[in-house]
Amino acid sequence: MVKIRLKRAGRKKMPVYQIVVADSRSPRDGKFLEVVGHYQPTLKPHSITLKKDRVEYWMHCGAQPTATVNSLIRATGLLYELRMKKLGRSEADIATEMEKWEAAQMARREKRVTLKARRRRAKKEAEAASASSAEG
């Protein structure tokens, strides 16, 4: 069986992964058929690059993505796009839907960042209040 999976590269404690198409019997960092992308988890935000046409080709040929790679493909919106193609939508419809999807993803990311900043601010205020009450 052919799998789309991660191949580790990079140095110690600084991983960089190649997204490769490989036979499921080959070892993690062993022989592979093709490199279809890269994933850098240490960057903020994470960097995911895919050759969308090649991923689509291999999935059409029957390659199964692993759970981690499936979530990375979903994060780029490729699975949503492939689903719409499978349903027979026109290219224009797919393009407008993908623009809406990207806008929703950006809004979700911004909301997450603002919530994180608000929590951090509240934590600092609570620490400052407890420190001032401990002094007095």
UniProtKB/Swiss-Prot annotation:
GO molecular function ontology, one term from the record: structural constituent of ribosome
GO biological process, one term: translation
Gene3D superfamilies the UniProt entry points to: 3.30.1320.10
GO cellular component: cytoplasm; small ribosomal subunit
Region feature Disordered, mapped onto this chain: 114-136
Keywords: Ribonucleoprotein, Ribosomal protein
InterPro entries registered for this protein in UniProt: Ribosomal_bS16, Ribosomal_bS16_CS, Ribosomal_bS16_dom_sf
Signal peptide range: none
Biased composition regions of type Basic residues, renumbered to the chain: 114-123
Pfam families: Ribosomal_S16 (PF00886)
Keyword Membrane: no
Family: Belongs to the bacterial ribosomal protein bS16 family.
Record's protein name: Small ribosomal subunit protein bS16
Source organism: Chlorobium chlorochromatii (strain CaD3)
Upper classification of the organism: Bacteria, Pseudomonadati, Chlorobiota, Chlorobiia, Chlorobiales
Gene label: rpsP
